[in-house]
Amino acid sequence: MTRHLKACTAKKDSAATASNKRRTRQTGIFHLVIEGRFQSAYWLHLNIRSDSMLRDLDHFLRAIWLECCGHMSAFRIEEKTYLSQLFQDTSFGWGPERQEYKMDTKLGKVLRPGMKFFYEYDFGTTTELSLRVLSYREGQMEERIRLMARNEPPPIVCEKCGAKADLVCAECIWAKGAWLCKRCAKNHEHDEMLLPVVNSPRVGQCGYTG
């Protein structure tokens, strides 16, 4: 997938440069791969401009994969933490030994090719992501973030009958019998906790419905 996307990107860049040479300025572009930190079946390939802020990436991840109740979030890049909202009490979260900053920081100032960093959404029922900077290039891109590829929904079967799972119980998700088809879900004891099976590493958590 990575090799294919690099080849396609090179072709598009060449075509864009030829047709838009006088209209669009060159900008730095990072190629990011984002995965569920403990659920690698869920992944995204993105192109993102280096003049974008961490907040832009935060908003994108919330929109495509995560947002349910307006929870807080954070990027962890090397020894620094970038929070969607800073706390007055610096002993919260990672403790006073970790430097905390706002997300109004440009990617070009904190990322470099080969770097791996992390993201967390919701500090209660936390969804964790790992991010890798595959490459950096100069090119033309009008939008700040471009989705290049994402995973197909992983096959998940009903734990009762083996059919395709449609629902997951947020109460039972770390136990047996959480993944259910619609028919088997009718007899589940926690029917009020059932959530739709969606293509996201946040599936089955908090109130996330996709």
Question: Where are the regions that the model predicts?
Answer:
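Short linear regulatory motifs enriched in tryptophan with gly/pro/ser
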Residues: 1-210
